[in-house]
A protein has these predicted regions:
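Active-site-adjacent C-terminal substructures of enzyme catalytic domains
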Residues: 234, 246, 255-371
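Charged helix-capping and loop-helix junction motifs
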Residues: 115-116, 147-151, 204-206, 279-285
Length: 371
């Protein structure tokens, strides 16, 4: 494993920013919180940060895609390859061959590394994102199940690749998918944003559990509008197995408070897809501030004004979770793209539907951090 030494860096540590250096290979091996820039006494590649920031890998909990790919496309299938791999693992001998590779002489070409989701994961990694939640749109039930199967297949394939290849090839797998963020279909029509209205549903715990089973139990976050019929029963049923987030909702303050007390514990992109936070009607944002609930925040300069961004950090502090909410257009040129069966246009960094509704963002999470 190649070793690295980064000197003259501003290190982001639990205690804050510290000037120093860092040594690492597959893991961090040493931190020096000083101006000592002497390289280690072993062979390594030395990099000079010139005072730049060195931060942990980013975790994007809300990203629909980028680099031309979208998790809702449901275009990944590993059935044949995984069947070959599992068959191969049964035969513990070096001469057994399966699907163009040997057990002890592994052929990387056996994996679909050029498929959209592998390319997407490598794009995330190139942007400093080391883990993410694959986020789906409001789709019809058939399409949602297909997306669950596709993401599960990709996760299992990536895990198999990591298990069967040397460390020096692991970057080809890209960032790690930690699970699924189910943004819809249990949303309010009036606050749907770019979600397809025809596919919206009342909160349905049975459907959620079926989707979760189809995903291999990978759903980690689900958004619900708490004012919808059945929302509280849904929250009580689902909150034991994943985080329930309030969002795409016209809920008033009292309803939002009650939903948090019923088990919801997160807010989807604060200020977007919800009622305004007014002095006599604070809505979800005011309820979250009162109870100290973690909130997502899109920092692309379009979804939330920079002054409000600063206010969110002052009010919520460490419970502010930056997200990209990126679409397939992130990392791509201006043009027309699809989103959950709808067309949107990317122009000068703004992704919007034909009626001007913001469709999501075209930034990476690293861009959000910089902003």
């Amino acid at each position: 494993m190649k070793r690295f030494f980064i000197k003259n860096a501003s290190l982001l540590l639990p205690c804050g920013l510290q000037t120093g250096s860092i040594e690492f290979d597959s893991t961090i091996t040493a931190l020096r919180r000083s101006n000592d820039s002497c390289a280690p006494d072993y062979e390594c590649e030395t990099l000079d940060a010139h005072g730049g920031f060195v931060v942990p890998g980013l975790f994007d909990i809300h990203t629909h895609g980028a680099y031309g790919a979208d998790f809702s496309d449901a275009d990944f299938s590993d059935r044949n390859v995984l069947n070959d791999i599992h068959e191969c693992s049964i035969h513990e001998c070096s001469i057994h061959e399966c699907s163009n590779y040997k057990c002890n002489e592994f052929d990387v070409d056996s994996f679909p590394l050029n498929s959209p989701l592998f390319r997407l994961s490598r794009y995330y990694l190139s942007q400093g994102v080391t883990s993410f939640l694959a986020t789906t749109m409001t789709l019809c039930a058939e399409e949602l199940f297909a997306a669950m199967h596709s993401i599960d297949a990709f996760c299992r394939m990536r895990d198999e690749f990591i298990k069967r290849t040397p460390n020096k090839l692991h970057h080809l797998a890209g960032a790690k998918c930690i699970g699924i963020n189910l943004e819809g279909p249990f949303l309010s029509s009036s606050k749907r944003g770019s979600q397809a209205e025809c596919n919206l549903l009342a909160p349905d715990a049975a459907l959620f559990h079926q989707l979760n089973a189809a995903s291999g139990g990978r759903i980690k976050l689900v958004t619900v509008a708490p004012e919808l019929p059945g929302a509280f029963e849904f929250i009580r049923s689902v909150s034991g197995c994943c985080t329930v987030s309030e969002g795409h909702s016209a809920a008033d303050y009292n309803t939002a408070i009650a939903a948090f007390r019923a088990g919801a514990s997160h807010v989807t992109h604060i200020f977007n897809g919800m009622n305004d936070c007014l002095h006599r009607s604070p809505g979800i944002a005011g309820a979250a501030a009162d109870l100290g609930i973690p909130v997502e925040l899109i920092c692309d300069g379009l979804h939330v004004h920079p002054a409000v961004v600063r206010g969110v950090f002052r009010v919520f502090g460490k419970k502010t979770c930056l997200i990209s909410d990126s679409l397939r257009c992130a990392g791509m040129p201006d043009g027309r793209y699809s989103l959950g069966g709808q067309e949107f246009v990317l122009s000068d960094g703004c992704a919007a539907l034909a009626d001007g509704t913001l469709a999501g963002s075209a930034i990476s999470l690293a861009d959000a951090v910089r902003n």
